[in-house]
Amino acid sequence: MFVRKTLLAALCATALLPLSAAYAADSQQFPSEQGSITATPVAKGLDHPWALAFLPDQQGFLVTELPGHLRFVSPDGKLSAPLKGVPQVWAKGQGGLLDVVLSPDFKQDRLVYLSYAEGGGEGGKAGTAVGRGRLAADLSGLEDFKVILRQEPKLSTGNHFGSRLAFDRDGYLFVTLGENNDRPTAQDLDKLQGKVVRIYPDGRVPDDNPFVGQPGVRPEIWSYGQRNPQGLALNPWSGTIWENEHGPRGGDEVNIIERGKNYGWPLATHGINYSLLPIPEAKGKTAEGTVAPHHVWEKSPGISGMAFYDGDRFNAWQHNLFVGALVSQELIRLQFEGDKVVHEERLLGELKARIRDVRQGPDGFLYVLTDEDDGVLYRVGLNQD
């Protein structure tokens, strides 16, 4: 078993990450229920950025771009050339280079994990892949990149890759896999479509996964019945894994992921088809043997990356969950009593930008990526008296 470690604790520095003076001049203030908030550009000129990770000791950031580039962003906002050693991606539709996370032991092993759309399927179709490589000391690229997980079969013609990555307290890697817009596969246990999987950091399957040893069932599966999971985060207080996913037309969900559970898609949904017709397989908003959403939006905001806030800088945000929204172009703040959502606030709508990812930085600020041709990495914080 792994030594329990918290990556942010290992990387944390209370000092502010330095910002470009030119970009700091572009800071904008917006209202919120808890006082005004400031959004300050850290970096501009990103090509549809998808995810970010914080390097230790205030070195800067790694940012993925959908067309297939991994970039180093210095603390003052300078973008590197695309890093070498990144796998070739299938950059069509929603496919491309997707999530990035650092190893829990990054200071020792320098391993960077990437998820991406990979071609090679029958009829030119694609699926999600996950791999890892060692970040070069000069930050110029990844070395010895190896694939540790492939979604099989590959069924996507451009949609629903999922692909979020998160480590739990014990060092297991959780990966969300979309159903490739092939609804019934989310219920098929011989396929990796519409699943959350749990693996060791090197791709091996833990013996205590729920379906290990069952004939015809993929042993990597931890949960199933997911549609297109776009957010994944470790709850820092309970240690549980939380996931969010796109509904069809309506029915975006937040779920607490439990071992071996069925989360319903497409048998249960709060949404309908984009054609305005019912989902053919759906039995209603609930179905026997499935887990109801922990939180649901009847009108889809198009949720994306999410992060729990457990920093010390902004006490008013403590125990809140922040969720990016692509369609409504906002940052959603969810407030809890225990695990129950009791309040929701919409933030940053004035930016009029698709928010693809949100992460809590080691300095206690939130960092937000906008999914645009000229994407921006923002630092977001409350203005405190």
Which positions does each model-derived feature cover?
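Bacterial N-terminal signal peptides that target proteins for export
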Residues: 1-10
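Bacterial N-terminal signal peptides
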Residues: 9-18
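Acidic, Gly/Ser/Thr-rich repeat motifs that build Ca2+-stabilized beta-propeller blades
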Residues: 23-183, 231-234, 239-247, 299-337, ...
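Blade/loop signatures of beta-propeller domains
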Residues: 23-38, 139-142, 204-214, 271-287, ...
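Beta-propeller fold detector
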Residues: 40-41, 80-87, 141-150, 203-211, ...
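Beta-propeller blade signature
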Residues: 129-138, 189-202, 257-258
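Mobile, glycine-enriched helix-loop/loop "lid" segments at the mouths of ligand-binding/catalytic clefts
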Residues: 197, 255-286
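Conserved blade-ending motifs and adjacent loop-strand segments that build the rim/top face
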Residues: 341-362
